[in-house]
Swiss-Prot record:
Protein name, per record: Isoleucine--tRNA ligase
Origin superkingdom: Bacteria
Native organism: Helicobacter pylori (strain J99 / ATCC 700824) (Campylobacter pylori J99)
HAMAP family: Ile_tRNA_synth_type1 (MF_02002)
Free-text cofactor note: Binds 1 zinc ion per subunit.
Classification via Pfam families: Anticodon_1, tRNA-synt_1
Cellular component terms per the entry's GO annotation: cytosol
Gene coding for it: ileS
Length: 920
């Protein structure tokens, strides 16, 4: 029998089924770099506006992990999506270069080398070199992800110009009257020997002693209450702070009960405390707390007086209703102390050990000198003697240093703060506090997800003043001079701008290198002897929080507009970068420095647990890229609900690889089947069939859905719409029905050419929607298809833009086939019956069948195409009958070329195939 395979249109494409991504992607990216792809993104001339995404800087220390990849890939998808919509893109990646982790790395390195480095300039030089090294490492690792941005000129917070900009932002805060030096309790990391801001504190479970202690009322108090014995009972989980107790706080207007044994507690808590065995059951007297105010008790640890005061923070839900108050070790205690003029006792050094103040103020025995507070607690508890009513251990949420993961303490020190509740002048001449301005600004920002708005609002509503100063070396100094004559900072503009100019020219190392005279402008140098330097450095959150000024404002729009269109970071940045940026923006410009905030979750393992080396559940980013390629990693990011935590395991990546293969193989099929098109046919109108109109209308519908989802940054929804279309309407219906025409019709056949135009339209939209995510792959698609490039008038992926399917195909409207849903229902019923006949061995495939449809209104051609039968009508040999149709054995012979049962003679081509063969 004659072989007809070579007469079919079995077109091939050089676009491979196997992507070999880990090998090919680096070559593609190198080409983009050579062609300056990002410059093209910056210079788009479609006049659809500009788009600025401001990069929250990663820390220049260590290698990238999967969390970094998640963040940078999401940003890349967002900016490419805006670019393909026709906008000019501004995106400058940056790095946070100062701070404690780098200091710790250098200190560990020096310890290994058994050397010390007292010279701060040389120490800072080592820190700078360390940051440079990892900045380059991370930059190269980012590029492997296929992300684009201004990586040729990234921002670095340690650059001289940048340090000067950070300092000028600080000066702006000072000029508004919001920067003040205060002696008050702040979070202190004894492990880092430095103050911490709220954003640098994380809460973890910690075991602590829980003790109930009796403070005996002094004689005058007993006489006032007309009782012989009364002891206020306090509860604390920080026995080490008892040395600094100066007061006991009660709830205002609350009832306090005195027991038979003389213990005084809140009546609302008496029953609970009696059940614990802290106090006895019998109540002999009741007092209003207001009548107890200003009584004096005795601290059993050191016999010092403890004043009874009233505080709004006192709870009647737990504890005793009598709160141990040490203004040197608690913020609420401190503010209560201001009201009652309480003494601030604080005798703990920067390492967390008791200092000589315990001796000078007779707070503790000298044997405690130099002992760490947590080690001393056991002795302190023992020293309480009979005043200790109950001791037990509890596990509770406790603040820890986010860098060292060690517990932190409250410690009163002199620090610099940005004041949240100090009114300052607004643009309209009114006065508002920073808290008020920030809360107003939040209302004008869009949040994705929307829950982020209330989260940030709550944090701003409840946050304390921002502690800016750090007792370290690697950072931007709080470069102010204190006038020794007045003990006030010099905020003269001439002095501050002179220092800023020095930083810009020589870097802020000069603050350590130069003497005071050389740091002052000439007109102030004669008074140098009256000044001393502030030697604290800035909280690194101020560095990163002021990046919008250094990157967007100082470059006057060359690197984007301020406020930026979008910022996109992990959800932890509500208490970090989003908050610091918001506060600085509100001080300097009375507005948020961003229009939209998008947040993502964290990377966790398949059980939902945080990844850590100790658990052995870390998934290596480098290994993922080598095994799957960056486009699969990018698709994994996009196909997950990134607004929640992302679970990761090899199983998830294998699933993603299947999604990727579906998209890739679909594109390969499309490319192959329009590869033989004559380019002259691209611009002329075509005669589209009802089936063509069906798929084109479906394409238009899903395009609107995908666009809408992507506009809302719902990548999962958009991709699921796209995947459902590819799987169901496209592959499951249209492509199956069109294969006969594509493979067997003449290349000049109008029906086939119309189908090819449809395939081009589908490929175009797939490329447009997938390009922000699978950029390497879509570049490869275009590289391997001259026809698609001509259709889109695009030489590569960066020329892509959205198309109007109607306009591109010269159509005014889509004409959906009549009764199409009925034909699809018929197809479903037919396939069920066909499966039964196949299992029974009656037929091998649908082409062996003829069908008589009982609903005569259905289009016969459409039925034949969609059901892929050889004949619609009655034939001799009945195979089966259902209420909707009757199946017959096809009445003609099998065509040896197209395999349809259309031939009038055995082993002879059907009429259609004969005509095609004549043309060849």
């Amino acid at each position: 029998m004659k072989e007809y395979k070579d007469t079919l249109n079995l077109n091939e494409t050089t676009f491979s089924m196997k992507g070999n991504l880990s090998v090919n992607e680096p070559k593609t990216y190198a080409k983009w770099q050579e062609q300056q792809a990002f410059k093209r993104m910056q210079n788009r001339k479609d006049n659809h506006g500009d788009f600025t995404l401001h990069d929250g800087p990663p820390y220049a220390n260590g290698h990238l992990h999967l969390g970094h990849a998640l963040n940078k890939i999401l940003k890349d998808i967002v900016i490419k999506r805006e670019y393909f919509k026709g906008k000019k893109i501004y995106y400058t990646p940056g790095w946070d270069c100062h701070g404690l982790p780098i200091e710790q790395q250098i200190l560990e390195q020096l310890e290994k080398e058994k050397t010390s480095l007292e010279n701060p300039t040389l120490f800072r030089e080592k820190c700078r070199d360390h940051a440079k090294k990892f900045l380059e490492i991370q930059k190269n690792e980012f590029l492997q992800l296929g992300v684009l941005g201004d990586f040729e000129d990234p921002y670095k917070t340690m650059d001289f110009k940048f340090e000067a900009s950070i300092y000028r932002a600080l000066v702006g805060v000072a000029k508004k009257g919001l920067l003040k030096e205060r002696h008050k309790p702040i979070y202190w990391s004894y492990a880092c020997e430095s103050a911490l801001a709220e954003a640098e504190v994380e809460y973890k479970m910690k075991k602590s002693p829980s003790i109930f202690v009796a403070f005996d009322l002094k004689k005058e108090g007993l006489e006032k209450l007309k009782v012989k014995k009364a002891s206020l009972v306090i509860w604390t989980t920080t026995p080490w702070t008892l040395y600094a107790n100066v007061a006991i706080a009660l709830k205002k207007d609350a009832v306090y009960a005195l027991t038979q044994k003389g213990y005084l507690v809140a009546k609302a808590l008496h029953e609970k405390l009696a059940a614990l065995g802290v106090v006895d059951n019998a109540i002999t007297h009741e007092f209003n707390s207001n009548d107890l105010e200003y009584l004096v008790a005795t601290n059993p640890l050191n016999q010092r007086d403890s004043l009874v005061v009233l505080g709004d923070h006192v709870s009647l839900e737990d504890g005793t209703g009598a709160v141990h108050t040490a203004p040197g070790h608690g913020e609420e205690d401190y503010y209560l102390g201001l009201k009652y003029h309480l003494e601030v006792l604080m005798s703990v050094d920067e390492k967390g050990c008791y200092d000589e103040g315990i001796i000078h103020n007779q707070l503790l025995d000298k044997s405690y000198l130099g002992e760490h507070i947590f080690k001393a607690q056991k002795r302190i508890i023992e020293q309480l003697g009979d005043s200790l009513l109950l001791e037990r251990e509890i596990e509770h949420s406790y603040p820890h240093c986010w860098r060292t993961h060690k517990p932190v303490i409250y410690r009163a020190t002199t620090q610099w703060f940005i004041l949240m509740d100090e009114p300052f002048i607004q643009n309209d001449g009114s006065q508002k506090t920073l808290r008020e301005v920030a809360l107003d600004a939040i209302e004008k920002v869009e949040f994705v997800p929307s829950s982020g708005k209330n989260r940030l609002k709550t944090m701003i509503e409840n946050r304390p003043d921002w502690c800016l100063s750090r007792q370290r070396k690697w950072g931007v100094p709080l470069a102010f001079f204190i006038d020794k004559r007045t003990n006030k900072p010099c905020f003269e503009s001439e002095v501050l701008e002179h220092v800023a100019n020095l930083f810009e020219e020589k870097g802020c190392d000069v603050w350590w290198e130069y003497n005071i005279k050389d740091l002052l402008p000439p007109s102030y140098q004669d008074n140098a002897k009256h000044y001393e330097k502030v030697m604290h450095i800035l909280d690194v959150w101020f560095d990163s929080g002021s990046t919008f000024k250094a990157v967007l404002e100082d470059y006057h729009g060359e690197k984007g507009q301020s406020p930026s269109d979008v910022v996109l970071e992990g959800s932890d940045q509500h208490r970090g970068w989003f908050q610091s940026s918001l506060l600085i923006g509100c001080v300097l410009n009375n507005q948020a420095p961003f229009k939209k905030v998008i947040t993502h979750g964290f990377i966790v393992d398949e059980k939902g647990e945080k990844m850590s080396k100790s658990k052995g559940n870390v998934v290596s980013l480098d290994n993922l890229l080598k095994k799957h390629g960056s486009d699969v990693v990018r698709l994994w990011v996009a196909f997950n609900d990134y607004q929640n935590d992302l679970r990761v395991s090899q199983t998830f990546f294998i699933q993603t690889e299947q999604h990727y293969k579906k998209f890739r193989n679909t594109l390969k099929f499309l490319l192959a089947n329009f590869s033989d098109m004559d380019l002259k046919n691209l611009e002329r109108p075509h005669d589209f069939s009802p089936l063509d109109h069906f798929i084109l209308e479906a394409l238009e519908t899903i395009s609107a859905g995908v666009n809408s989802a992507f506009e809302e940054h719902d990548l999962v929804k958009g991709l699921n719409i796209l995947m459902a279309f590819v799987t169901n309407e496209l592959s499951g219906i249209y492509l199956d029905a069109c294969k006969d025409s594509l493979y067997c019709d003449s290349k000049n056949n109008e029906k086939r050419q119309a189908i090819q135009m449809v395939l081009l339209a589908v490929a175009s939209q797939l490329c447009y929607f997938l390009a922000p995510i699978l950029t390497h792959t879509i570049e490869e698609v275009l590289e391997h298809s001259q026809v698609l490039r001509a259709f889109l008038q695009a030489k590569d992926v960066f020329d892509l833009k959205g198309i109007s399917v109607l306009e591109k195909l010269h159509l005014k409207e889509f004409k959906k086939p009549e009764n199409f849903e009925a034909v699809l229902a018929l197809r479903s019923a037919f396939n069920e019956e066909l499966d039964r006949l196949k299992k029974e061995g009656v037929v091998k495939n649908s082409l062996e069948c003829a069908i008589e449809v009982k609903e005569k209104a259905l289009c016969e051609n459409l039925v034949e195409e969609l059901l892929m039968v050889s004949f619609v009508g009655v034939a001799k040999e009945k195979l089966s009958e259902t209420p909707a149709f009757t199946l017959f054995k096809a009445p003609f012979y099998k065509c040896p070329r197209c395999w349809r049962f259309k031939s009038e003679l055995e082993n002879t081509p059907c009429k259609r195939c004969e005509e095609v063969l004549k043309e060849r």
